[in-house]
Amino acid sequence: MEVRKTIRCKLVGLTRRKRDLLNREYDNFQHWLETGEDKGVYSAYKQDAKWLYKKAKRMKGVPIRKDLIDIQRRDTKIAEYWARIRVKGVRGGVKVALAHQPFNFEAWDICESLLVRKDGDFYLYVTVKKDVALKEEYASIIAVDMGARWVAVSVARHRSKPKFYG
């Protein structure tokens, strides 16, 4: 069974140049969606928007395909994970630090991402997927009984004594 999950990562430690580049790319993309006039948007973002969002006049963020995003683990004080976001005019893109995540990106496959700006801060919504085996038998089962005398009674399979709540 395939499981999908969206991880919300804040971009931290942005320099003024990186923030200006991301703001320019974000604003130019939104302007291109509204008017159709290209003020300098990365071409792959335009291709995705033409294909996916034919009727959208404004979007929540900039969609990023999985082949355009690169998330790697680095041993730095700023952040454990770094992402490379493609921007028009910068060869190779902009390397940004992702806020400390209790998530292991190496164990999952990265699908697509969305670059979002909220209150002047940038967030990267990364969608990941993984194939997991469905369990057919569980080791611990908890039964909850809602009653009139006791609000709730729970019994775990491995424990023989019930717990009374109420």
Predicted features, each with a name:
Residues 1-166:
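Nucleic-acid substrate recognition interfaces
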